[in-house]
């Protein structure tokens, strides 16, 4: 499946049905009076989040979306039926913007819904305009037009852990070894061309990890492919920085990524960060210890060591305990789907 994280679509909510102008016609009733019914409301266009979708691929093939119009009213005070709402499922983490680039809605939680295009109100039938001074009104109103607009959808993947690092650091191998993620793995730059999600289950708890591809020097300016995916790091609560321990200068490798995060969005470097020296099976134990101490002294952080032979249980266990503790201390979030 292709990964699409941005799309532009045209929305047209349903028009309201027209009201009806009619009069009661029955035998032996000379002046039956007005009995025109109201028109039905037009259908709304609703966006809703789904756990079963992780891309905006649907909108590559469906760029014009129209809801059903309301039906007109009829005699005997019968109201027209309202048009059906269209409910469009999008991934959690989707943001909706209007043509001016103003945020309409941020769909960042499960089972979130928002009406993006409001259907038109149905017209009023002439039965509603009968008064003591006007017993036979012929007046009725037309249904209102439904909203129409162009919107832009932008997906920012939400995960517990964002895996960052230079190409070939072993991010995809790490993700694949500890989750059920099916990622392409090879020894050349930019093997991973799109974000991959994986779910690890440790100590009966769930941990969602995202492999963020393409981070190199100048990524924030568009070099490599990192500028397309730096935005996904914004939605990761914690960063897992993987460094290839076979590199001559691991400090430079570390600072290269940190600099790109800072230049893209200075808030990113304030995210909690765990550091892993990867591919430790390719070096002597003495050399690994030396590099671990060097990086620990420089970053003032605990350094984990990993290799393809490890099951990474200790690293994941530490991460999941940290995330669980962090979530336990978080403020409860109450969502109102109609308060944009």
UniProtKB/Swiss-Prot annotation:
Subunit field text: Monomer.
Pfam families reported for this sequence: GTP1_OBG, MMR_HSR1
Sequence similarity: Belongs to the TRAFAC class OBG-HflX-like GTPase superfamily. OBG GTPase family.
Entry GO MF terms: GTP binding; GTPase activity; magnesium ion binding
Cofactor: Mg(2+)
Record gene name: obg
Lineage: Bacteria, Pseudomonadati, Pseudomonadota, Alphaproteobacteria, Rickettsiales
Residues annotated to bind Mg(2+): 172, 192
UniProt name for this protein: GTPase Obg
